[in-house]
Amino acid sequence: MAPLGASPRLVLLFSGKRKSGKDFVTERLKSRLGGNICALLRLSGPLKEEYAREHGLDFQRLLDASTYKETYRRDMICWGEQKRQADPGFFCRKIVEGVSQPIWLVSDTRRTSDIQWFQEAYGAVIQTVRVVASEQSRQQRGWVFTPGVDDAESECGLDNFGNFDWVIENHGDEQCLEDQLEHLLGFIQAKL
């Protein structure tokens, strides 16, 4: 059930592998749409905040792309999975509390349970977006395969999801990416 007061016109659920460019794409869309129209939501935000609180860590440092975050990533994944097993909608509910903008971009959807929660809560306004990048492109962005991370559900949970409503190819061709974003922006603006 959707939290009270939350009635978005469109919720885009973004997913993709580490270093595929999910944050880059969603930040770009938000900058074009504006903060009064578009909310950028991260499921990892409340997860990292709660994990930092329970483990006495620096929450702000867990938010950046630092080695600090990478040091705790594997344990944080296991901890988050335990929370989700107890309550699959725990982190989903947290990120939508108090959001008033009509367009929501969820930048880090990682599991079918995340998608199911949003579909049950918001129905027809949900669109799934997969950001894909070649392994070579991801490596150029600093990705290195990490056992226990890149083969965990947090990275592979949507590999066999089926058909996404949108697929954004982010292999490093700026014009190709721009064309895809323009198409998606047209769809979003039609919902306003």
UniProtKB/Swiss-Prot annotation:
Name recorded for this polypeptide: Phosphomevalonate kinase
Binding residue positions for substrate: 170
Organism: Mus musculus
BP term (GO), one: cholesterol biosynthetic process
Subcellular location: Cytoplasm, Cytosol
Alphabetic keyword roster: ATP-binding, Cholesterol biosynthesis, Cholesterol metabolism, Cytoplasm, Kinase, Lipid biosynthesis, Lipid metabolism, Nucleotide-binding, Steroid biosynthesis, Steroid metabolism, Sterol biosynthesis, Sterol metabolism, Transferase
Entry annotated with the keyword Transport: no
Enzyme kind, highest EC tier: transferase
UniProt function note: Catalyzes the reversible ATP-dependent phosphorylation of mevalonate 5-phosphate to produce mevalonate diphosphate and ADP, a key step in the mevalonic acid mediated biosynthesis of isopentenyl diphosphate and other polyisoprenoid metabolites.
Annotated residues for binding of ATP: 17-23, 141, 171, 180
